[in-house]
Amino acid sequence: MTKFRSSIAVKKGMCTLFLLFIYVLGSRIALPFVDLNSRNFLGGSAAYLDFSVALTGGNLRSLSLFSIGLSPWMSAMILWQMFSFSKKLGLNSVSSEVQDRRKMYLTLGIALIQALALTTNLPVQAPYNPFLVFLLNTSLLVAGTFFLVWLSDINATIGVGGPVVILLASMVASLPQDIIQSIQVHKISLGLLFLLLVLGVLFTYLVVLFYRARYRIPINKIGLHSRFKRYSYLEIMLNPAGGMPYMYVMSLMGLPSYLLLLLQHLDKGNPLYSAMLEQYAMGKPLWIYAYILILFVFSIAFAFVNVSGQQIADQMKQSGDYIYGVYPGEDTSRFINRLVLRFALIGAVFNVTLAGVPILFVLQDESLLKVSMIPGLFLILSGMLFTIHDELQALRLNERYQPLF
């Protein structure tokens, strides 16, 4: 029992559970002076936005302190990665402290847009001043987002999983309700439900296969002298991006809806914003085609974010390691990037097939939207669980050795 309590994995796990308790507690703190019984805010878009916000730690169903979740921070990370590819901007030339500060400024700007779009459409209770309630709730929503960012950083330091745990908790809280509601609405028979369960098991097997499959590149290490093993290996996943592109796509694609809602409130006489909101609504053809295209592009882009040929080549050059038959430096970088691109295309096709193709059924029946999103949700869920599992395995590695005396 003493050994169990002294385990690093157990200590970090307990810290994570405590931080999750704080997250759940904060998600139950409702925004003040708001009519929680009204569901007609956001121009009727609440049901669609709630689905995407739930993937980023938010919840529009309860209108709480954490309603917009980590979505602004995730959108800021995507935009920062896009901007950093431009050498003219020189974003990577400054110190990491300056970069982190600028990322927070970008997060603040996006959080303000989302908070303003939400608070301008909230149903305020009659006796209170709408403007003061608007200022108060906007401040609370922005503060809630930054509190979640801080909570994620704390969990990354003393807990397990970093921000993934918060996103996982939000998904687990909303996913069962959406599945049960979809089964009730479409009156799925037991036979069809059994078939879906079989397909779910097959889907889980494919996800595990793609996540665990690795391509190993033999690396010659100067300091490695063993007649039993000449090489160490650089491993590249069959799907280098994993399931994370799906979640980031949902976060980024929700941003235009918030911006249009805010513009619609500022320019109420202009019918253009209402028409654009209607055409871009979740489940509409424009949204579906944009979603599939961005998912494909992000699956390739995130592969190069996770496996950077330039960084690996630089590290190998500094340590004196090399790939047999490939010159160190730029040749090694190009060799690795070609492999990453090849596997990124395989992963992109896999992600689009499992998380994108089912959404095409929504073109025939919009009520199938939540059902068609379930494969993508399981793709994210599997990736999160594997990430947490791998981190726990790494923490337990040092505990497998017993002291000599």
UniProtKB/Swiss-Prot annotation:
Q: How does it sit in the membrane?
A: Multi-pass membrane protein
Transmembrane parts of this sequence:
14-34, 65-85, 104-124, 131-151, 156-176, 190-210, 243-263, 285-305, 343-363, 368-388
Q: What is its main location?
A: membrane
Compartments annotated for it: namely:
Cell membrane
What keyword terms does UniProt attach to this protein? Cell membrane, Membrane, Protein transport, Translocation, Transmembrane, Transmembrane helix, Transport
Q: Which InterPro entries match?
A: SecY/SEC61-alpha, SecY2, SecY_dom_sf
Q: Name one GO cellular component term.
A: plasma membrane
Entry keyword annotation includes Nuclease? no
GO biological process terms on file = intracellular protein transmembrane transport; protein targeting
Q: Record's family?
A: Belongs to the SecY/SEC61-alpha family. SecY2 subfamily.
Function, as annotated, reads: Part of the accessory SecA2/SecY2 system specifically required for export of possible cell wall proteins. The central subunit of a protein translocation channel.
The record's section on NCBIfam families has: acc_sec_Y2, PRK12417.1
- Self-association and partners: Component of the accessory SecA2/SecY2 protein translocase complex required to export cell wall proteins. May form heterotrimers with SecE and SecG subunits.
Descriptive protein name: Accessory Sec system protein translocase subunit SecY2
Gene for this chain: secY2
